Amino acid sequence: MAQEKVFPMTHEGKQKLEQELEQLKTVKRKEVVERIKIARSFGDLSENSEYDSAKEEQAFVEGRITTLENMIRNAKIIEDDGGSNVVGLGKTVSFIELPDGEEESYTIVGSAEADPFEGKISNDSPIAKSLLGRKVDEEVTVQTPGGEMLVKIVKIS
Protein backbone atom coordinates (compact mmCIF):
# COMPACT_ATOMS: atom_id res chain seq x y z
CA MET A 1 0.00 0.00 0.00
CA ALA A 2 1.38 3.40 -0.97
CA GLN A 3 2.12 5.84 1.81
CA GLU A 4 -0.07 8.96 1.79
CA LYS A 5 1.69 12.24 1.11
CA VAL A 6 2.05 14.47 4.17
CA PHE A 7 1.16 18.14 3.73
CA PRO A 8 3.12 20.42 6.07
CA MET A 9 1.17 23.59 6.83
CA THR A 10 0.54 26.20 9.44
CA HIS A 11 -2.56 26.07 11.65
CA GLU A 12 -3.84 29.13 9.74
CA GLY A 13 -3.30 27.36 6.42
CA LYS A 14 -5.26 24.31 7.57
CA GLN A 15 -8.11 26.55 8.75
CA LYS A 16 -8.25 28.22 5.31
CA LEU A 17 -8.47 24.83 3.62
CA GLU A 18 -11.22 23.74 6.03
CA GLN A 19 -13.16 26.94 5.27
CA GLU A 20 -12.80 26.41 1.51
CA LEU A 21 -13.95 22.79 1.91
CA GLU A 22 -16.97 23.84 3.94
CA GLN A 23 -17.90 26.49 1.35
CA LEU A 24 -17.59 23.98 -1.50
CA LYS A 25 -19.71 21.37 0.29
CA THR A 26 -22.44 23.68 1.59
CA VAL A 27 -22.72 26.41 -1.04
CA LYS A 28 -20.93 25.67 -4.30
CA ARG A 29 -22.07 22.05 -4.58
CA LYS A 30 -25.73 23.13 -4.21
CA GLU A 31 -25.28 25.93 -6.77
CA VAL A 32 -23.89 23.49 -9.33
CA VAL A 33 -26.69 20.97 -8.74
CA GLU A 34 -29.20 23.78 -9.30
CA ARG A 35 -27.42 24.80 -12.54
CA ILE A 36 -27.61 21.20 -13.76
CA LYS A 37 -31.31 21.03 -12.88
CA ILE A 38 -32.03 24.25 -14.81
CA ALA A 39 -29.94 23.13 -17.80
CA ARG A 40 -31.83 19.80 -17.91
CA SER A 41 -35.08 21.72 -18.18
CA PHE A 42 -33.89 23.11 -21.53
CA GLY A 43 -34.48 19.69 -23.09
CA ASP A 44 -32.09 17.83 -25.39
CA LEU A 45 -28.85 17.25 -23.47
CA SER A 46 -26.83 16.27 -26.56
CA GLU A 47 -26.42 19.90 -27.65
CA ASN A 48 -26.93 21.64 -24.33
CA SER A 49 -23.85 23.76 -23.58
CA GLU A 50 -25.28 24.96 -20.26
CA TYR A 51 -25.63 21.34 -19.13
CA ASP A 52 -22.12 20.44 -20.31
CA SER A 53 -20.67 23.48 -18.56
CA ALA A 54 -22.48 22.71 -15.31
CA LYS A 55 -21.35 19.05 -15.40
CA GLU A 56 -17.73 20.18 -15.97
CA GLU A 57 -18.00 22.54 -13.02
CA GLN A 58 -19.48 19.76 -10.91
CA ALA A 59 -16.52 17.51 -11.75
CA PHE A 60 -14.11 20.30 -10.82
CA VAL A 61 -15.89 21.00 -7.50
CA GLU A 62 -16.00 17.30 -6.56
CA GLY A 63 -12.33 16.91 -7.49
CA ARG A 64 -11.38 19.91 -5.37
CA ILE A 65 -13.41 18.55 -2.44
CA THR A 66 -11.55 15.23 -2.67
CA THR A 67 -8.19 17.03 -2.87
CA LEU A 68 -8.97 19.25 0.12
CA GLU A 69 -10.20 16.32 2.21
CA ASN A 70 -6.96 14.47 1.47
CA MET A 71 -4.80 17.50 2.30
CA ILE A 72 -6.64 18.14 5.58
CA ARG A 73 -6.57 14.46 6.57
CA ASN A 74 -2.81 14.30 5.93
CA ALA A 75 -1.93 17.76 7.27
CA LYS A 76 1.12 18.04 9.51
CA ILE A 77 0.81 21.24 11.50
CA ILE A 78 4.02 23.24 11.71
CA GLU A 79 4.56 24.32 15.28
CA ASP A 80 6.23 27.70 15.69
CA ASP A 81 8.98 27.29 18.25
CA GLY A 82 8.94 31.06 18.75
CA GLY A 83 12.57 31.56 19.61
CA SER A 84 14.37 29.90 16.75
CA ASN A 85 16.80 32.06 14.83
CA VAL A 86 16.95 29.55 11.99
CA VAL A 87 14.90 29.74 8.78
CA GLY A 88 12.23 27.03 8.81
CA LEU A 89 8.65 26.26 7.90
CA GLY A 90 6.23 28.82 9.26
CA LYS A 91 8.97 31.44 9.59
CA THR A 92 9.08 34.76 7.80
CA VAL A 93 12.51 35.51 6.40
CA SER A 94 13.68 38.91 5.15
CA PHE A 95 16.71 39.20 2.89
CA ILE A 96 18.41 41.63 0.56
CA GLU A 97 19.88 40.81 -2.80
CA LEU A 98 23.56 41.66 -2.81
CA PRO A 99 25.27 43.93 -3.55
CA ASP A 100 22.54 46.58 -3.30
CA GLY A 101 19.07 45.11 -3.73
CA GLU A 102 15.87 45.94 -1.91
CA GLU A 103 14.66 43.96 1.07
CA GLU A 104 12.18 41.17 0.36
CA SER A 105 10.23 39.09 2.88
CA TYR A 106 8.53 35.72 2.49
CA THR A 107 6.87 33.29 4.84
CA ILE A 108 7.93 29.72 4.15
CA VAL A 109 4.95 27.37 4.20
CA GLY A 110 4.00 23.93 2.93
CA SER A 111 3.04 23.64 -0.72
CA ALA A 112 -0.66 23.31 0.18
CA GLU A 113 -0.86 26.91 1.39
CA ALA A 114 1.74 28.62 -0.81
CA ASP A 115 0.54 31.89 -2.34
CA PRO A 116 3.29 34.15 -3.71
CA PHE A 117 0.81 37.05 -3.98
CA GLU A 118 0.44 36.90 -0.18
CA GLY A 119 4.20 36.52 0.33
CA LYS A 120 3.91 32.81 1.15
CA ILE A 121 6.31 30.53 -0.69
CA SER A 122 6.44 26.75 -0.70
CA ASN A 123 9.19 24.97 1.18
CA ASP A 124 9.74 23.13 -2.13
CA SER A 125 10.52 26.36 -4.03
CA PRO A 126 14.13 27.06 -5.05
CA ILE A 127 14.32 30.18 -2.85
CA ALA A 128 12.99 28.39 0.23
CA LYS A 129 15.22 25.37 -0.31
CA SER A 130 18.24 27.69 -0.38
CA LEU A 131 17.18 29.53 2.80
CA LEU A 132 15.98 26.66 5.02
CA GLY A 133 18.30 26.03 7.96
CA ARG A 134 20.15 29.34 7.53
CA LYS A 135 20.58 32.16 10.07
CA VAL A 136 20.58 35.97 10.14
CA ASP A 137 23.63 37.57 8.49
CA GLU A 138 24.35 34.49 6.37
CA GLU A 139 24.94 35.06 2.68
CA VAL A 140 23.26 32.47 0.50
CA THR A 141 23.30 31.74 -3.22
CA VAL A 142 19.71 31.26 -4.35
CA GLN A 143 18.70 29.50 -7.56
CA THR A 144 15.91 31.32 -9.39
CA PRO A 145 14.37 30.88 -12.84
CA GLY A 146 16.39 33.94 -13.87
CA GLY A 147 19.66 32.45 -12.62
CA GLU A 148 21.62 32.63 -9.40
CA MET A 149 21.48 35.54 -6.98
CA LEU A 150 23.37 36.19 -3.79
CA VAL A 151 21.26 37.26 -0.81
CA LYS A 152 21.93 38.18 2.80
CA ILE A 153 19.41 37.16 5.46
CA VAL A 154 18.57 40.20 7.58
CA LYS A 155 15.65 39.01 9.74
CA ILE A 156 13.83 35.83 10.76
CA SER A 157 10.51 36.00 12.61
From Swiss-Prot:
The gene is greA. Necessary for efficient RNA polymerase transcription elongation past template-encoded arresting sites. The arresting sites in DNA have the property of trapping a certain fraction of elongating RNA polymerases that pass through, resulting in locked ternary complexes. Cleavage of the nascent transcript by cleavage factors such as GreA or GreB allows the resumption of elongation from the new 3'terminus. GreA releases sequences of 2 to 3 nucleotides. Belongs to the GreA/GreB family. It holds the Pfam family GreA_GreB_N. GO terms for molecular function: DNA binding; RNA polymerase binding. Residues 10-76 form a coiled coil. GO terms for biological process: DNA-templated transcription elongation; regulation of DNA-templated transcription elongation. Gene3D superfamilies: Transcription elongation factor, GreA/GreB, C-terminal domain (3.10.50.30), Transcription elongation factor, GreA/GreB, N-terminal domain (1.10.287.180). InterPro entries: GreA/GreB_C_sf, TF_GreA/GreB_CS, Tscrpt_elong_fac_GreA, Tscrpt_elong_fac_GreA/B, Tscrpt_elong_fac_GreA/B_C, Tscrpt_elong_fac_GreA/B_fam, Tscrpt_elong_fac_GreA/B_N, Tscrpt_elong_fac_GreA/B_N_sf. This is Transcription elongation factor GreA. Keywords: Coiled coil, DNA-binding, Transcription, Transcription regulation.
